[in-house]
């Protein structure tokens, strides 16, 4: 059987990414698995020397084909910092943002070439990314640009709750101006395709409303009747099992209890808050609509605890395992 290899990007090296990657790859189930880290080898060794990460072998390779996977060995394709000795933990730095960008770019190239079958990303810092001149709102938009993907969406994934977003990194004030029937219908379609890929035969998809009580028949806004309902009607006509618009304050609980397989959230915090409340340590961020599987730990760089040994690796480990499963 063909080995499915996953590339793991370091994210911002001044954050918890280097720590949680090495911790995750030292766990049972991932120790010795077909995984390749793309990041600054000097930074990984620096954390290991401080006793922050397990004492495993960090083996440098130039190509994925050179890897010989075995327990106790982590293979690293080195993307060096310009000044590794100048890197400071927990601080926004241009060289850290540039490294995070280069790691994602390298992993994307490997995935598009078929050298790896999926990528799992550790968190990057958006301010550092911008400071380095890479003006993307986050991983999702960066990956879409690198892969020339037009129809894509952010999925947050746990065993009991799955959420896909119509919009993500946009000011709430601007969100309503960009909301369209076409975009909502596209995201419903992405949700249906994604759920079928992960094993759902007839996915049940709920569409959350925009306004309180999903507009209450126009009393609190008309986006539901004017924008969402036509998208739902069109999706149903294509054979999709879609419900809504549903009141946002109850639809996530209904999905959590098994009534729906995925919720279409309208904007960033509408989808993120319930999922992070219920699955902060085991939630996974997935970019649906790319030509390959991309997963990520569902948290940020945690600069406040960077390089202290306090970072928990559960979400990173779950994201890597899911990438292996879906690849």
UniProtKB/Swiss-Prot annotation:
Keywords: Carbohydrate metabolism, Metal-binding, NAD, Oxidoreductase. Pfam families: PdxA (PF04166). Substrate binds at residues 139-140, 276, 285, 294. A divalent metal cation binds at residues 169, 213, 268. Binds 1 divalent metal cation per subunit. InterPro entries: PdxA_fam (IPR005255). GO terms for molecular function: metal ion binding; NAD binding; oxidoreductase activity. Its EC number is 1.1.1.408. Gene3D superfamilies: Isopropylmalate Dehydrogenase. SUPFAM superfamilies: Isocitrate/Isopropylmalate dehydrogenase-like (SSF53659). It comes from the Bacteria. Its cofactor is a divalent metal cation. Belongs to the PdxA family. PdxA2 subfamily. Catalyzes the NAD-dependent oxidation and subsequent decarboxylation of D-threonate 4-phosphate to produce dihydroxyacetone phosphate (DHAP). Can also use 4-hydroxy-L-threonine 4-phosphate as substrate. This is D-threonate 4-phosphate dehydrogenase.
